[in-house]
C-alpha cells in the first residue's frame, strides 16, 4: 500500500513538471516570435527635382565661339601681337566678315605687321579697316601725320577707327579737349567720321556726352550685351579678347554688330 502511494505521488510530480514545461516552452516561442518580428518601414515618397541643363557660354567653354551660337555679323581686330597670320585660312571662315588692323600708335609707332596684314587680308576677300591707338598727351599733329602715312584711303574698305583707352594722366577736361581736336583732324583728313573703340567702363567715366555724333565699338567681356550709362546706341560689341580662329595662333579680339547695325554703316566713302 505504501509503495502504491509513493508511485502515485511520483506520477503526479512528473505530470506537473510536464505541464509546466509545455507552458514555458509555448511562452518562450511566443516571446521569440514577438521579438524577431520584422518591421517594414513605409517608404517615403521622394519628389524628383527637375534639372534644367543650360548650354555653356563662350566664356565657360573656350572651344565655343560666339559666331557658333548666333546669326550676327562677326569680325576681328589684329596687330603685331598675333604674329604671322595665315590669311588664306582666315579668309575661308565665312563667319568672319571684317577685320580692323592696327596701323599706328602715338606720334611715331608703326605696327610692323600692318603692311603685310592689309595686303593679304584684301587678297583673301576680307573687308578691312585700320585703327590708331590714341595717346592724349602726344602732339596731335604728329599723331595725325603718323596715321595718315600708313592708313592710305585707297586701301580702306571701312572707316578708320580710333582706339581710346587712356586719359594719359590728363584731367577729364584736358583729355576730352585733346580727343575732340583729334577726332576733327581725322574727319578733315578722311572726309568721314571715324569709329571710336573704347571700353564700357572707360566710356561711362570719361566720355559721356562727348562723342554723341560718332559710332561706337564697345569692349566688354561678358555674356551680356553692353549697356552704357546714357543708354546710347552701340554699333559694335567686342565681346572677347580670348577668341580663337583658324589661321591665327593664340587669342584674338572678336566683335560683332549690335541690333540692326551692319557693314554698310562702316563703308569707307571714296
Model-derived regions: residue spans:
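Bacterial N-terminal signal peptides that target proteins for export
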Residues: 1-9
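Bacterial N-terminal signal peptides
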Residues: 10-18
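Sec/Tat signal peptide C-region and signal peptidase I cleavage site
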Residues: 20-25
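Boundary/entry segment of secreted carbohydrate-active catalytic domains
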Residues: 27-97, 102-104
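Functionally critical loop-and-helix segments that line ligand-binding/catalytic clefts
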Residues: 53-75, 211-270
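Substrate-binding cleft of extracellular glycoside hydrolase catalytic domains
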Residues: 62, 68-83, 91, 101-183, ...
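Flexible, glycine-rich phosphate/dinucleotide-binding loops
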Residues: 108, 137, 203, 225, ...
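Catalytic domains of cell-wall/extracellular-matrix polysaccharide-remodeling enzymes
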Residues: 158-231
Amino acid at each position: 500500500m505504501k509503495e502504491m502511494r509513493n508511485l502515485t505521488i511520483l506520477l503526479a510530480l512528473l505530470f506537473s513538471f510536464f505541464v509546466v514545461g509545455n507552458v514555458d516552452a509555448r511562452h518562450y516561442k511566443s516571446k521569440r516570435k514577438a521579438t524577431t518580428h520584422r518591421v517594414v518601414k513605409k517608404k517615403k515618397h521622394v519628389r524628383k527635382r527637375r534639372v534644367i541643363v543650360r548650354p555653356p557660354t563662350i566664356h565657360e567653354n573656350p572651344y565655343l565661339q560666339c559666331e557658333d551660337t548666333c546669326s550676327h555679323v562677326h569680325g576681328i581686330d589684329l596687330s603685331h601681337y598675333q604674329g604671322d597670320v595665315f590669311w588664306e585660312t582666315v579668309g575661308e571662315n565665312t563667319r568672319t566678315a571684317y577685320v580692323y588692323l592696327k596701323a599706328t600708335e602715338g606720334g611715331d609707332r608703326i605696327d610692323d605687321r600692318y603692311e603685310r596684314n592689309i595686303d593679304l587680308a584684301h587678297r583673301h576677300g576680307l573687308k578691312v579697316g585700320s585703327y590708331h591707338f590714341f595717346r592724349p598727351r602726344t602732339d596731335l599733329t604728329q599723331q595725325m601725320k603718323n596715321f595718315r602715312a600708313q592708313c592710305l584711303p585707297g586701301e580702306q574698305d571701312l572707316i578708320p577707327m580710333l582706339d581710346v583707352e587712356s586719359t594719359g594722366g590728363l584731367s577729364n577736361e584736358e583729355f576730352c579737349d585733346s580727343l575732340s581736336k583729334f577726332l576733327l583732324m581725322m574727319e578733315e583728313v578722311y572726309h568721314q567720321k571715324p569709329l571710336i573703340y573704347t571700353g564700357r567702363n572707360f566710356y561711362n567715366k570719361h566720355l559721356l556726352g562727348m562723342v554723341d555724333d560718332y559710332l561706337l565699338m564697345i569692349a566688354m567681356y561678358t555674356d551680356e550685351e553692353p549697356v552704357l550709362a546714357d543708354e546710347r546706341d552701340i554699333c559694335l560689341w567686342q565681346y572677347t579678347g580670348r577668341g580663337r580662329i583658324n589661321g591665327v595662333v593664340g587669342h584674338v579680339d572678336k566683335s560683332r554688330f549690335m541690333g540692326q547695325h551692319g557693314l554698310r554703316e562702316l563703308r569707307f566713302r571714296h
